[in-house]
UniProtKB/Swiss-Prot annotation:
Species of provenance: Streptococcus agalactiae serotype V (strain ATCC BAA-611 / 2603 V/R)
Protein name (database record): Phosphate acyltransferase
Pathway(s): Lipid metabolism; phospholipid metabolism
Gene: plsX
Pfam families in the record: FA_synthesis (PF02504)
Catalytic activity field: a fatty acyl-[ACP] + phosphate = an acyl phosphate + holo-[ACP]
GO molecular-function terms, A-Z: phosphate:acyl-[acyl carrier protein] acyltransferase activity
Protein location: Cytoplasm
Subunit structure, interactors included: Homodimer. Probably interacts with PlsY.
Alphabetized SUPFAM superfamilies for the sequence: Isocitrate/Isopropylmalate dehydrogenase-like (SSF53659)
Domain of life of the source: Bacteria
Amino acid sequence: MKKIAIDAMGGDYAPKAIVEGVNQAISDFSDIEVQLYGDQKKIEKYLTVTERVSIIHTEEKINSDDEPAKAVRRKKQSSMVLGAKAVKDGVAQAFISAGNTGALLAAGLFVVGRIKGVDRPGLMSTMPTLDGVGFDMLDLGANAENTASHLHQYAILGSFYAKNVRGIEVPRVGLLNNGTEETKGDSLHKEAYELLAAEPSINFIGNIEARDLMSSVADVVVTDGFTGNAVLKTMEGTAMSIMGSLKSSIKSGGVKAKLGALLLKDSLYQLKDSMDYSSAGGAVLFGLKAPIVKCHGSSDSKAVYSTLKQVRTMLETQVVDQLVDAFTDE
């Protein structure tokens, strides 16, 4: 049985979206057991399943505007800290939260701990592509600054995940840069390029540009945390703007526009789905001793369900255990 702890109070639509996602996952997956951390009365209001679900009551929670490190130190009975502690103590095997990102990073580092040999855990998520396959990208903001050595480790971590969790036999690893030529970039990217090109355990395909990300040019994209977070927010904003603009144009375009939209209904839904983060799962804080996964703050029940499915696969493939062995052997 795979035991997964969840912060039921984290996120914009908690606990409703969290619990509804759990209801669906429990119904679909007979090999998972979920521990919900949060306000029992509020959780029970939406909980429809009773088997393989337990509630650990606490009224304390970390808010979105709390200072991350201080909140983790001071709010030891919060739903987030208790969930992370459950993983540390072996009560749960993985932890999910849609709450304060910085606080989750702090809880992951200070409570769960990083894998020996990993310098800086990175935040990794599977990003959408036009063909629906997606690519894994890290770091998406766990670290504001990185060294070439960090990017080298991210390439190994990302390749490991793509192969073992997503089932890509030989993942293509690309370095996000301001040009595809080998000589492009600042000193950080030039040094990182040399390290990645010399790494025998990955299939490094060279530099890639941001404009090509959604064209499936790579299975794993490596970048520093500052750039990665900026790219993530840009992709999210662009997707929202495109869909919003299409909707406005159809509404204001008269009968012809509405008829055209009706004829293109299936194609428009396909476009919407290709840009939808909710089916990809959450962002993994990769490099820790256990799977710690961050749901988007605005996650609905579908996104929570997808994240539970993702974590179930991570536990099934024992990707973190394999990583521990790999880095210990180095």
